[in-house]
Amino acid sequence: MSGIGSRAAVFGATGAIGGALVHELKARGTDCVYALSRHTATAKADGIIPLIADTLDEDSLAAAAAHIGAQGPLDTVIIATGQLHAPGIMPEKALREIRPEAMAAIFAANCTGPALVMKHFLPLLPRGRRARLAVLSARVGSISDNRKGGWYSYRAAKAALNMVVRSAAIETARRAPEAVVVALHPGTVDSALSLPFRSFIPAGQSVAPQIAAARLVTVLEHLHPEQSGRLIAYDGSIIAP
């Protein structure tokens, strides 16, 4: 069993960071990793179990939680989902670019979906021992750290997600005082999310998904209950809300 437990679930397992997290958890000794995604493309391997679950489909989340929960509690849950852009949707540079349907889609992907995962999967954390749920957020969701403006929908959705994490941490502590619920900032990662902005990223400031995953798992290994509800960067530092 690894330092973050024997049983884990990763949402967004077919994404760059999510897939890397699945393999990093296994490499560090987690016995069983459930790899959840909307379309199962993760190959079944020793200790890696692919499952279909859509973060915006409560029936699929309930079914996945029931299936996994029947096998026992989870030591680690990681929600590695999110959306910055999509066909016809790009981050806004000015207020005049805000469109309600685009903003709703970004909020759904970055806040509503993870909140629904918490609703169904936080009850699977054990009551009497250390466990953790982490969701990928972003530094741009920090209100106090916003110096450049823009990216209205994405920034607001991540700020809302950070508030959901805080409230979920408070609620979870009443049932499972050793559990830790956090938002994680992975840094800039070579992925589909950052691809349209690659030319604007200074050399050396973007890392491979495998490096990002290793950093995040190290952070998870050292979490303690006093950090619950916080936004934590890949280097373990606390980001102010």
Q: Model features per residue range: what roles?
A:
Residues 44-61:
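Rossmann-fold cofactor-recognition segment
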Residues 179, 183, 191, 195-241:
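C-terminal helical subdomain
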